Amino acid sequence: MNSRRSPLLVFSGQSNRPLAQAICDNLGVPLGRSRTEKFTNDNLIVHYEESLREGDVFIVQTFSTPVSDAIMELMLMIDAAKSASAGRVTAVIPYYSYARSDKKDSPRISIAGRLVADLLQEAGADRVLTMTLHSPQVHGFFKVPVDHLSADVVLSQHFKKCVPDAHNGVVLAPDAGSIKRASQIARRLDSGLAMIDKERLSDTEVRPRALIGDVDGKTVFIVDDEISTAGSLVETVSIARSMGAKDVYVAVTHGVYSGPAIERIAALDVTQVASCNTVLVPQDKLDRAGGKLAVLDVAPLFASAIANIHTGASVSTLFT
């Protein structure tokens, strides 16, 4: 796509307009004018209030509660943009919630991660930009290009800011699935690495087995892709404390904070729990967490990725 003839246009759904506005502020472009209405029968309709013809359109929509509304609104925005003769449409999905559903692990279920990918492409998405998929293989469900950003740099910088001698600490992976991310952050911090071996019994219940590594007397940095109900986090912190951890910091990409998560975090024996602004955390949740929650800004990273996609530059250079 020739960026000289294709204006950069950024629009937002309703799920996380503050992030979309911050992305535009970093890009130095105005947030596009659009509105979504809901009829009395619960149907949605999207209106663009400016021309999209031949534009390089980026639509920011995170898949947070209510997830089904967020997905439907994004598909309507993509379809409306294509109908308005947009030159290219990129779906910017900071948090892709159906990434957990990546395989058929029980009879008679849908692989929802693949289904949502199919729906987005059928709606007309030419490209997808997302961050820290729970299951990276979801990337392969798309036939269109997917740029998968990592928040590792942001999380690492945050730990260094909180603890100047972070290199003396230990990065703790809550399970085997997060060891790759933890090892990358440990490399950036030049710190130690540990892992908890555990068994997941259900979506909300885990059974820890053992901590592999040494955390005794050390500052521990727990990293993961997301916090949902915080049940797994409670177990991880409990084990780390029982093994002699001194101070505990937690940082994840996506702070979903569903169900009893906020109450659990407020009671948790940690210094701080940080998450990125891929999911909008309401002020009342921040207040109820007793000052333990922090929000990290990934708008500059998304803005750089959008700028590089628009001009045809590499995106992978942003987090290597």
Swiss-Prot record:
Species of provenance: Deinococcus radiodurans (strain ATCC 13939 / DSM 20539 / JCM 16871 / CCUG 27074 / LMG 4051 / NBRC 15346 / NCIMB 9279 / VKM B-1422 / R1)
An annotated GO cellular component: ribose phosphate diphosphokinase complex
Taxonomy, superkingdom: Bacteria
Recorded name of the encoding gene: prs
Ligand binding (Mg(2+) 1): 134
Enzyme active site: 198
Name of this protein: Ribose-phosphate pyrophosphokinase
This protein's pathway: Metabolic intermediate biosynthesis; 5-phospho-alpha-D-ribose 1-diphosphate biosynthesis; 5-phospho-alpha-D-ribose 1-diphosphate from D-ribose 5-phosphate (route I): step 1/1
Alphabetized PANTHER family for the sequence: RIBOSE-PHOSPHATE DIPHOSPHOKINASE FAMILY MEMBER (PTHR10210), RIBOSE-PHOSPHATE PYROPHOSPHOKINASE 2 (PTHR10210:SF32)
GO biological process terms on file: 5-phosphoribose 1-diphosphate biosynthetic process; purine nucleotide biosynthetic process
